[in-house]
């Protein structure tokens, strides 16, 4: 971590810290000294001390995401939203006082919010300095089911979901895997849509980050079904919607969502990405 942070500092780069009190369906993972507490028993003091120590050590951190894929955790436990809001507020106040230039917020999966109709959870957790969103143009089975134009329209829903607070785009992507209906042409077109969205809404955006620069070898991107808790199923004897089916597609999606392939060849979207960066610098 120190080497990476030193590299970022030498190149005058700022860093977003993803702390993950909540990480999708689960709490944590936490360091051993925290153990495995329930949401209501997480110590505010311990979290404040841990985050304070990190922010003092790495002064290039300018944003902190306390929870990620937050809508998934509260999907079946909305009664715990007030508990989390109290925890967040209790941590936010002292840290903001000591580190006034650091922004604190939570992240949501925009495609999860849209696919599962969970916008009300985002609205109830409108806390902190910003609300961040990740985005894959996929259905609940992790197959691409949007055109770049439709995906661009999905991004516009962020402005309606969070009208009065800064927004962040955290880990946005488009896979080129044919296995999940991806193509290089559509990835390139989506890069254009992302920059159109950025330029139109720049005053309201805290940050925008692409999910992955480089592809990874197939099968190395997510947990295996055996290590995944719970079961995703549509019922009956069909394998459609099973853990294995969904995770297989997520593997293919993530491993091929980079802008440069595993052989080091630049995809057309990489050239478009660099062109758009240059256009933004010159505008």
Map each language-model feature to its residues.
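Active-site clefts of carbohydrate-active enzymes
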Residues: 23-29, 133-139, 158-194, 210-231, ...
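Aromatic-rich peripheral "rim/lid" segments of glycoside hydrolase catalytic domains that contact
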Residues: 179-180, 185, 200, 204-205, ...
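Acidic (Asp/Glu)-rich catalytic clusters
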Residues: 2-16, 53-59, 120-127, 157-163, ...
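Short, acidic/polar
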Residues: 43-55, 113-124, 188-197
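Substrate-binding cleft and catalytic face of glycoside hydrolase catalytic domains
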Residues: 2-80, 87-103, 109-111
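The substrate-binding groove and active-site-proximal loops of carbohydrate-active enzymes
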Residues: 32-44, 69-82, 136-148, 181-185, ...
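Conserved, mostly hydrophobic/aromatic
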Residues: 64, 91, 131, 171, ...
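Aromatic- and acid-rich polysaccharide-binding/catalytic face
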Residues: 17-19, 59-62, 66-68, 106-110, ...
């Amino acid at each position: 971590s120190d080497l990476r942070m030193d590299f970022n500092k030498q190149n005058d780069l700022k860093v977003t810290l993803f702390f993950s009190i909540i990480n999708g369906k689960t709490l944590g993972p936490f360091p051993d000294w925290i153990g495995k507490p329930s949401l209501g028993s997480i110590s505010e003091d311990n979290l404040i001390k841990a985050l304070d120590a990190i922010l003092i050590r790495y002064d290039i951190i300018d944003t902190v995401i306390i929870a990620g894929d937050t809508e998934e955790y509260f999907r079946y436990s909305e009664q715990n939203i007030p508990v989390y809001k109290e925890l967040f507020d209790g941590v936010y106040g002292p840290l903001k006082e000591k580190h006034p230039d650091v922004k604190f917020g939570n992240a949501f999966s925009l495609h999860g919010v849209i696919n599962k109709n969970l916008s009300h959870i985002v609205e109830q957790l409108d806390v902190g300095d910003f609300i961040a969103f990740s985005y894959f143009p996929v259905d609940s089975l992790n197959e691409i089911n949007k055109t770049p134009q439709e995906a661009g329209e999905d991004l516009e829903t962020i402005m309606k979901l969070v009208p009065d607070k800064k927004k962040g785009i955290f880990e946005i992507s488009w896979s080129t895997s044919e296995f999940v209906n991806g193509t290089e042409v559509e990835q390139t077109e989506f890069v254009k849509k992302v920059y159109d969205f950025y330029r139109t809404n720049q005053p309201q955006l805290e940050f925008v980050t692409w999910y992955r620069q480089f592809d990874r070898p197939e099968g190395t991107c997510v947990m295996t079904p055996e290590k995944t808790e719970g079961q995703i199923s549509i019922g009956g004897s069909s394998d459609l919607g099973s853990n294995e089916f969904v995770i297989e597609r997520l593997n293919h999606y993530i491993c091929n969502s980079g802008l440069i392939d595993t052989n080091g060849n630049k995809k057309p979207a990489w050239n478009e990405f660099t062109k758009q960066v240059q256009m933004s610098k010159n505008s």
